[in-house]
Amino acid sequence: MAAHSGGAFPLARRARTALRRVPVWTWRLMMRSVSSRERVRFNTDPVTEVAYVHDLDYVGDGLRAHRLDVQTPLSVAQTSAEGAVARGGSLPVYVYFHGGGWTSGDKSALTKYCANQALGGMVVVNVNYRHAPRFHMGHVLEDANAALAWVVANIKEYGGDPARLILGGDSAGGQISALLTAISRRPELAAHYSLLPAVPAGHVKGLVQHCSAVDFSVFFESGFVLSLNFVRMLLPATAPLTPARLKSAAGYLSPIEWLDGSHPPVFVTTSERDFFYRSNLNFIARLQDHGVPVDALVYPWASANTEHTWQQDYRYPESQEVYRRLHAFVGNVAGPPAGAD
């Protein structure tokens, strides 16, 4: 099957022949050029065995950045929520955050990806959030936490179990979901972002990471593709930081720094073609150091389809393998509904 050639990261690789590192403004232009094409390509031949509810406002301010979609297997959607819960039939909930370098992207490009996961026996919540550089990481995590609060309050109506959550995302969205998982377990990180976690730590049963930015130390390595302004834009506006202070501040953006033995199991997918390959390998190793169960699917360079965030494109056999492994992962970590025999 033909290699993935339409995404922003192959463009970024080519741009690096002219630029030592890709700056934020160049990234935003590249994303603008590919986003509409990705939305069409990734959603060809919609999944019909899933019920779709689009653009639910999880904050109440009418912003598109504060909308989410819910996708439920038809077998559950056609049954009243009360009946499903009474039979102990509520499903685990997979809450997903899209990527886009924190500056771009939209949940609409992930509709079919999310539907394919719903087919695996889960309710899927597909979340938008505010983007940098207008908003910093504190705002993004505030949105993500608000989305979880909405899930806790409302997901039973869609057949989901708010006590069996799996968080996930790709690229920047993976970093958001990983930080949110850490915030549920690390009070000092929650305090840093002035957040009261919307979900008890024990209700987050697992974490899914697709080509995620989980170790920010790679931004400071020679030859990394993205400029340090990606780090700066995620921090609150301050006087310019020295390199040492910028690296210290990046620790609060870097999920790897907040891992411990209490972390839930993780499913990681990456490849040697992924710009965050080293970041993901470091994350896997740190999880293993802490004794956290981790299922890692890592493709070699020879797998030409596996450019950064290939998982969104259902046409690739490598994506189908991700989906099979993800379904099994959720089934293994979610556990039975409360009160089930």
What is each model feature region?
Residues 2-341:
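Alpha/beta-hydrolase superfamily serine-hydrolase fold, recognizing
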